[in-house]
């Protein structure tokens, strides 16, 4: 279990993202007291570079994204990443996605990605962020038609949504260009 030991945790809100990536990397759950304390913090004064460093570690070293990103959801930090938050409210057709909604599907995909990393940091960064962003268009395109859940055009719609998300994390134009078509 990951747990803050003093209230100094609040002096640098980046520690919330650090807990996210440590949780995903090491397989530790975050203690409920730390989750509650994290809810009181904001990332508004954290530079993009520092934010990106923690997301980069998550993508390159995370093994259990359900733990890491699940912590982000539990401490309500998905409010800073509405593109991800919306995935949790978007159902999918259970015939094609028995694992559940788009959020759950994305976490499963990230866990699968973690098992096949290539060893090339750049390639893993591109693929990892592509996996994270691959269904961001579904919340804006999902419809129920003839009792089936469909998301026509979600890939195309997701490009600008993913671009906005990535631009808030990093100014690495080459990375964004390679992640997005």
Describe these PLM feature segments.
Residues 176-181:
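Phosphate-backbone recognition surface of nucleic-acid-processing proteins
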């Amino acid at each position: 279990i990951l747990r803050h030991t003093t209230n100094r945790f609040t002096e640098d809100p980046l520690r919330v993202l650090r807990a996210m990536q440590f949780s995903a990397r090491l397989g530790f759950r975050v203690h409920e007291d730390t989750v509650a304390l994290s809810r009181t913090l904001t990332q508004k004064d954290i530079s993009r570079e520092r934010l990106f460093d923690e997301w980069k570690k998550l993508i390159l070293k995370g093994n259990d994204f359900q733990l890491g990103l699940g912590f982000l959801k539990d401490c309500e930090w998905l409010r800073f990443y509405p593109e991800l938050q919306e995935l949790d409210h978007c159902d999918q057709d259970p015939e094609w996605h028995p694992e559940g909604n788009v959020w759950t599907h994305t976490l499963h995909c990230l866990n699968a990605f973690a098992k096949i990393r290539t060893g090339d940091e750049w390639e893993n960064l591109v693929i990892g962020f592509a996996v994270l962003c691959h269904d961001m268009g579904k919340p804006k395109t999902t419809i129920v038609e003839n009792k089936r859940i469909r998301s026509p055009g979600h890939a195309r719609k997701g490009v600008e949504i993913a671009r906005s998300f990535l631009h808030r994390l990093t100014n690495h134009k080459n990375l964004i260009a390679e992640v997005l078509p």
